[in-house]
Amino acid sequence: MTLPAPRDGSPAVPRLADIAAQAQVSEATASRVLNGRPASRXSTRQRVLAALDLLGYERPTRLRRRSAGLIGLVTPELTNPIFPAFAQVVEQALAGYGYTPVLCTQIPGGATEDELVEQLEERGVNGIVFLSGLHADTTADPRRYARLTERGVPFVLINGYNERIRAPFVSPDDRSAVRMAVRHLADLGHRRIGLAVGPDRYVPSRRKAEGFADALAEILGTPRDQAEQHVRRTLFSVEGGHAAAGSLLEQGCTGLVCGSDLMALGAVRAARERGLDVPADLSVVGFDDSQLVAFTDPPLTTVRQPVHAMATAAVGALLEEIAHQTVQRTEFVFQPELVVRGSTAQWVPGG
């Protein structure tokens, strides 16, 4: 059989064994798919074709199919690495079902979410995936989404459940994420723990703050009405984390939980500017498990969002809507995971 050529035009040709290993199938099965002969299941065929894509090789002409349609993906600006991570999985999942993703990124001074949606509708998209959009802002008018439904445009929303919007939502358990971070710091001996999080009008920020108050009460016995003293609300950015950490350090906090990995990196910077060592003097926990945080100095302890599971579920719900199948217009909540690295350590008073 003739294996496909690489997309970059280089002469190297992939081994059948590489494709089979990537797809987790036998070489015989991979060969049947590449030669256009039926495989045992459609899902097997999709795995082999996805393996070709991941290895960077063009699909054989006979295996290509016309696009099933266009799906819009509306995201915030991509400076936060968690958003490109979500976008990549969503795009791969859509491509696996034959859809062509149309990425629409919001940038300062650029098109608004409403303007991007209007452009997508003009292009005749089959549906839209919203990632951390206006639906997560409790001060935004939710009627924009009701109007989408009235116009017959299927959509799904990732992060930021809003009970005023009737649509499938996919979210991480923000409260649980913060509780496990606080538990981790408490187990290391920390008793003065602070939270750096985004503005209260955003649902994920609000839920993280609620989880923080619950955790302080359950684990450290801190009255809920006192938890707010240990919360700083700012931007989900390095600069925001830097400012929040500076304030919490002045309060004597030895452990910080941050609402994003970028905020956590800002907290590390704030500690070092004050001559403090991370983690000897200050333990820091991020949120997201963004690409590269395992390689920062120190490697960042963080709470991992289940990006692949969430993005795949969002695509599945959207495709069910497009197919006019019954879809629960509710929130699908996914459990995060604590990833312990080098930015947290045992607290030794006076050490």
Swiss-Prot record:
Claim: Transcription is one of the keywords in the record: yes
InterPro entries: HTH_LacI (IPR000843), LacI/GalR-like_sensor (IPR046335), Lambda_DNA-bd_dom_sf (IPR010982), Peripla_BP_I (IPR028082)
Protein species of origin: Streptomyces limosus
CDD domains: HTH_LacI (cd01392), PBP1_AglR_RafR-like (cd06292)
Official protein name in the record: Uncharacterized HTH-type transcriptional regulator in aml 5'region
Record-annotated DNA-binding residue ranges: 16-35
Function statement: Putative sugar-binding regulatory protein for the alpha-amylase gene.
Keywords, comma-separated and alphabetical: DNA-binding, Transcription, Transcription regulation
UniProt keyword annotation of Ribosomal protein present: no
GO molecular function: DNA-binding transcription factor activity; transcription cis-regulatory region binding
Domain HTH lacI-type positions: 14-69
